[in-house]
Amino acid sequence: MQIVCLDLEGVLVPEIWIEFSNRTGIPELSKTTRDEPDYDKLMRGRIAILNREGLGLPDIRKVIEGMQPLEGAREFLEWLRSYSQVVILSDTYYEFAEPLMRQLGWPTLFCHELVADESGRVRDYRLRLRDQKRESVKAFRKLKFHTVAAGDSYNDTTMLAEAHAGILFRPPENVATEFPQYPVANTYEELRAEIVAASRVR
């Protein structure tokens, strides 16, 4: 049995925080895990900026409602789900993900939770598990799944290392340079070929 683990943002959907940064005109919010490997530092900074600017969960959701999956993502995911078990491992939040998951046909998603007050002001975030991507892949391997993982950012590299095969999808140059051991796919056709090459399905 095989399972393919995919990151969400940058692989199937646009980066939510970059889109929100563009819509609000706050460049500080454009920083992502492609730029900052320390996730807690990244999130604490985001929450501080949101509170400083008087922005909350409703403002972010409004932007997400207008977003769509990356071009070709739905077709790629449809093929992949017919080929292998698939799970999305993401450092996004359930409070963000619903509109995009609906457009992708409700794939299985493991992610985190935001803590917001009654007014929608973001107070904190709650991790499902520290380094949950890696821990999920480790658990799948323990369950005797042949695991293939694909992602684009620093926070994906531990799950790529834990999987039987790891693939970088459209990574920024700094990530590709620091992790040359992983093949790079720049299109869904290339990603499909890399997954098939690493598979034990057919």
Question: What role is predicted for each listed range?
Answer:
Residues 86-91, 145-186:
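Acidic, Mg2+-coordinating phosphoryl-transfer loop and its flanking beta/alpha structural elements
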Residues 94-98, 156-157, 192:
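Short, well-ordered alpha-helical microsegments
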Residues 94, 161-163, 196-202:
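An extended, acidic
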Residues 117-125, 176-183, 193-197:
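Short, charged, surface-exposed secondary-structure boundary motifs
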Residues 95-147:
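Substrate-recognition "cap/lid" segment bordering the active-site pocket of phosphatases
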Residues 2-113, 117-118:
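Alpha-helical substrate-recognition element adjacent to the catalytic core
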Residues 78, 138, 157-158:
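Alpha-helical segments flanking ligand/cofactor-binding loops in enzyme cores
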Residues 110, 182-191:
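Short acidic-hydrophobic, aromatic-tinged amphipathic segments that line or gate anion-handling sites
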